[in-house]
Amino acid sequence: MVDKTSIQEAVKTALSKAPERKFKESVDITVNLRNIDMSQPKNRIDETIHLPNGFDNVKIAVLGKGDIVTQAKEVNVDLIIGPEEIERLGGEPREARKVAGEYRFFLAETAMMPLVGRYLGVRLGPRGRMPMPVPQGMDIRPIVQRLRSSVKIRTKDKKVFHTKVGTSGMEPEQIAENIDAVLHRVESVLESGTMNIHSVYVKTTMGPAVRVI
């Protein structure tokens, strides 16, 4: 696999070629795979990857009541959904779709999972965002902190995936470290590792793509 220095140079080029904006753009990578049959579920990637350098806009929702809600408030979780709200959202498909699209990670009390599956499964499932079950008594605070520095990779049946790896306000070295973390994790779950990766591109939201591999 490509070394961190080469990744960092590609990131620097992508940042330098990006049009000047008054806001922080996302920095994303596109990874194209090869020599792998994605029609076979065992070959598909579905991974949550912790990044060494997080960014501040990963939204997390917690579904439940009682102690899990208290903990969620302590770590400023972006959205808390109680059992009544779960049922209400089940009857509001447009609002439920918005929630499924806006929040990246979901945590839910294990006891709530049947309710979530019944009312929100059709919205969350296809996006790969069914909640992580949380047993009663588990401390969710460290989990939330870790997820805030994580990305979700999900290929379904396609030989390509895209993921955010930083923002234009981060140092190139930090973004390169995040890209390296993603690629190493993906290599570890691919049948032939590096040989299954055809190409990798990095770009800002509005900038041109720069080839890494």
Swiss-Prot record:
Keyword Glycoprotein on entry: no
Keyword ATP-binding set for record: no
Segments passing through the bilayer: none
Recorded GO CC terms: large ribosomal subunit
Segment forming the signal sequence: none
Subunit relationships: Part of the 50S ribosomal subunit.
Functional description taken from the UniProt entry: Binds directly to 23S rRNA. Probably involved in E site tRNA release.
HAMAP family: Ribosomal_uL1_A
Protein name, UniProt field: Large ribosomal subunit protein uL1
Source organism (scientific name): Methanoculleus marisnigri (strain ATCC 35101 / DSM 1498 / JR1)
